[in-house]
Amino acid sequence: MTNEQRKTVYNKQLELNNRILGERFGLNILELNEEQKQIWLLNFCRATTHELYELQDAILNEDDHNIVVECVDILHFIVSIGQILGLECNQCFSYDPLFETTRWLDCIMPKIEKSRKLINMLEDSVNWKWWGSKTVDWEYTKDVYQWLLSDFYSLVSLLGI
């Protein structure tokens, strides 16, 4: 993906998020308060988890078209999570390149499971525990986001998209 394409995806997603959040809830994704960030990060994490299950089904059913559709859906939710975290476009798409593999399917399913675990980590990072502190470590949440983004790029690369 070129820098121009990344900017387009980021800006279009920002526009869509603000239109949806604005029309339905009177919110701007870049101006959410602490509680709203938590709520929407959890919403987008849950949606991403759902899309990961759909991607797994598409892979198992060898549905090439739907594999691409699900990856695009996942990308939109990941970009939305980055926007909630206050990341600029270049930060949203910045990652460390990962590994290459020869055992395609044996590698894909664990990557999907790892992505689901990272989504759970994101959810846990903003869910308050009754026994813990009542604050969110947003820097840790951004770190988990970077792991998720890196994992997503690896998954898309393995799928040849």
Question: What positions do the PLM features span?
Answer:
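Flexible "arm" and connector segments at domain edges
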Residues: 1-161
